[in-house]
């Protein structure tokens, strides 16, 4: 039995190219970084990393563009979508929205003495960094905005507006390729760290609001179902959940 015709967001060519770049990213950066194999490494890359980052960000912006309230910002995002689509289908490097960044992140890279953070919030931050997915348009100041997509241990950024060139979005990825020196890499002292902290606090507040809406009977059923899942309890995820007070 054969499946019906498959729909492609960008067309068959671009989806096939994305699949190849995704495999390269997974094998050369994602898995080695998660295994702490890149702390002192230098990783050479060609155009595949730039293509992969834009492809990921294009998908995020396509799904979120209708929720952008600011008409001027939305207009810029529509242009970015068009430029990225053309590039992903074999066109030139985007002429306007071409500042693409990758930000690997883990506990060691996030740890900071700038904020007096309670231990239970640090655990939530680590959960966010190591496990969570997220996306949004980050607005540091009125004229500093960037789209981001977060997967476990990585942020991808595309600059939409930028006045402050000191903002640290991580590693600038070149469309011509280059080399990443992980030994010298850091995510700066403030800015993004403060953003992550506030993002986690906002999520905790939303979760607390949702938790209050659940009846005690519903909560008991959820807890009983979770406690009987031995596989979850004995897993790395289960350990992290217990540390966060969610099991």
Stretches found by the model and what they are:
Residues 29, 34-36, 67, 71, ...:
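Generic alpha-helical propensity signal that fires on short helical segments
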Residues 31-48:
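Short microdomains enriched in Cys/His and/or Lys/Arg
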Residues 21-29:
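Short cysteine/histidine-rich zinc-coordinating motifs and their immediately flanking basic loops
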Residues 74-247:
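C-terminal, charged low-complexity interaction regions
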Residues 17-20, 50-89:
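Short flanking/linker segments adjacent to small metal-binding domains or redox-active Cys/His motifs
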Residues 8, 12-14, 52-60, 150-152, ...:
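Structured loops at beta-to-helix junctions and adjacent beta-edge loops in soluble globular domains
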Residues 1-21, 34:
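An N-terminal structural lobe/cap that precedes and organizes the functional/catalytic core
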